[in-house]
């Protein structure tokens, strides 16, 4: 890991490294950090008390953030016939089959989400080396393999995101922009935590949510006191 930038080191001097903040306190600190030339993403990093090596302790799902992500989503749809027209009319940025399959296979990834009709998955599945590492492979569980193309596009445009446990037992996701009002960011973060709580595997024992940190793209990472939130502290 590289050395923190001078900017981060200066910000860190004003923070108590031992303190666990409330969600609202952390948001307010990030918003008061010196501005940069772009609207930073607010990111959540959550360590879970599960074993990522066990298939019965996988944590994965989706959540519709109540205030969106603040990001303009570029959506690619793999479909044929009338579904291509339906996709474009619903707001897809790209829609089609053979030409797009070939383009993605060549390494093109100028999009943020992929939706596919079930009949396209045999071909889309062959793009695993390109889509998989970027978390872009459509799945039925995420609602991105569907015949209801319009609904899937509308949900993604409105702020539906997918979360997935990594090999270290951590979930990392963007949940909004620094420019959002504090209460809207807090609503998004709490909706995100509720979704992860509901996705708790039945086989998971002990404390489920182990630690939580909130950061911005160019800002510090702030430890959150999970006890201040009933939903995060509660063990079911």
From Swiss-Prot:
UniProt-listed PROSITE patterns: RIBOSOMAL_L1 (PS01199)
GO cellular component: large ribosomal subunit
GO biological process, any: regulation of translation
Molecular function terms from GO: rRNA binding; structural constituent of ribosome; tRNA binding
InterPro entries given in the database record: Ribosom_uL1_bac-type, Ribosomal_uL1, Ribosomal_uL1-like, Ribosomal_uL1/biogenesis, Ribosomal_uL1_3-a/b-sand, Ribosomal_uL1_CS
Alphabetized UniProt keyword annotations: Repressor, Ribonucleoprotein, Ribosomal protein, RNA-binding, rRNA-binding, Translation regulation, tRNA-binding
Pfam families from the UniProt entry: Ribosomal_L1
Intrachain disulfide bonds: none
Subunit-structure text: Part of the 50S ribosomal subunit.
Job of this protein: Binds directly to 23S rRNA. The L1 stalk is quite mobile in the ribosome, and is involved in E site tRNA release.
Listed PANTHER family: 54S RIBOSOMAL PROTEIN L1, MITOCHONDRIAL, LARGE RIBOSOMAL SUBUNIT PROTEIN UL1M
Family that this chain belongs to: Belongs to the universal ribosomal protein uL1 family.
Protein name: Large ribosomal subunit protein uL1
Organism of provenance: Protochlamydia amoebophila (strain UWE25)
